[in-house]
Every structure is written in C-alpha cells, then in structure tokens.
Curated annotation (Swiss-Prot):
This is RNA pyrophosphohydrolase. One of its GO terms (molecular function) is mRNA 5'-diphosphatase activity. HAMAP family: Nudix_RppH. Keywords: Hydrolase. GO terms for biological process: mRNA catabolic process. Accelerates the degradation of transcripts by removing pyrophosphate from the 5'-end of triphosphorylated RNA, leading to a more labile monophosphorylated state that can stimulate subsequent ribonuclease cleavage. It comes from the Bacteria. A motif (Nudix box) lies at residues 38-59. PANTHER family: M7GPPPN-MRNA HYDROLASE. The gene is rppH. CDD domains: NUDIX_Ap4A_hydrolase_plant_like. Residues 6-149 form the Nudix hydrolase domain. The keyword Hydrolase applies. One of its GO terms (cellular component) is cytoplasm.
Amino acid sequence: MIDDDGYRPNVGIVICNRQGQVLWARRYGQHSWQFPQGGINPGESPEQAMYRELFEEVGLSRKDVKILASTRNWLRYKLPKRLVRWDTKPVCIGQKQRWFLLQLTSNDKDINVQQSKTPEFDGWRWVSYWYPVRQVVSFKRDVYRRVMKEFAPVVMPLQEQVSMSRPSYGYRRKRY
C-alpha cells in the first residue's frame, strides 16, 4: 500500500527500559542497526500494525509493554535512489512513519528477535537514549532525530528517576 506521493505507510517502535535506555536491533546478516519498524497492512490501524510488528520482530506482545507516547504526525524519509525498486508499480520512494514509544514492562529475557520464521534481526542490545541518532543509516537519521526529540520529554524523567534512586557517594575534601 503506497500513497499517491510514493511513500509506504509504516510504524516505527522505540522500546525503552526502566533506566531510559532504548532497544537497538541488528539487521539480520548485516552490520547495520535500527529500531523495529514495519509496514501497515490495508485495514490495519497504526497501533494494530505496531503490536503485530512488535511480536514479529522482537517477540513481545501487548502484555509486555506500555505505550508511553506516539508521534503527532507522520514522519517521512526518502530511500536512496540505489534502493528504490523502479520496476514495481506503484514506485515506492520512501516511508512515512508513525512512531510509538513503549516501555518494557516484562523482562529482557522475553525479547526474542528470532520469533519469526524470517527474522528481521539477529541481535539486540540496550543503548543510551541518543545513541541511535548517530548510528542509524544516514537516510533515516533526520527522522530518528525528530522522533527522539519528540519523545525526550517522556523518557528523560525516567532517567532522572533512576539516577535519583541511586545512592549518592559524594566525597569530602580533607581540610588541612
């Protein structure tokens, strides 16, 4: 399902843990990493697509996460010309995405990137919040920056709660 402008409707998923870190997944058989994402099927809402992709790509279900936020608008990126399939009709020149910020409410052990018969990912790890903006492939970088900027007011308080719950081991200078 490609819109009149050549963009494929898609959802992107940012999963954070209680420490405010985000799940970063390695694409199957590649050295590139990204957030889980996937197309919206005809008749499917963005939220329904998000839950389907969540299960297909990382093996998590609705009971394993809590929706914290979603982007207000569709965010778009164009594919590099070398990745556009010019022989298909209609031609898809990029993705338009609705993004969801989820908090993992279950355990790390519930994450399973091998859930699908044709897995998208072969590994994953927790990374600091802003890390993906610098590391994602260049043509997705602007969308990632916009997503993370929009979600930051929700995630930053989580990080502050964690740092405030840790004991502070300050030191006193010895006076002579």
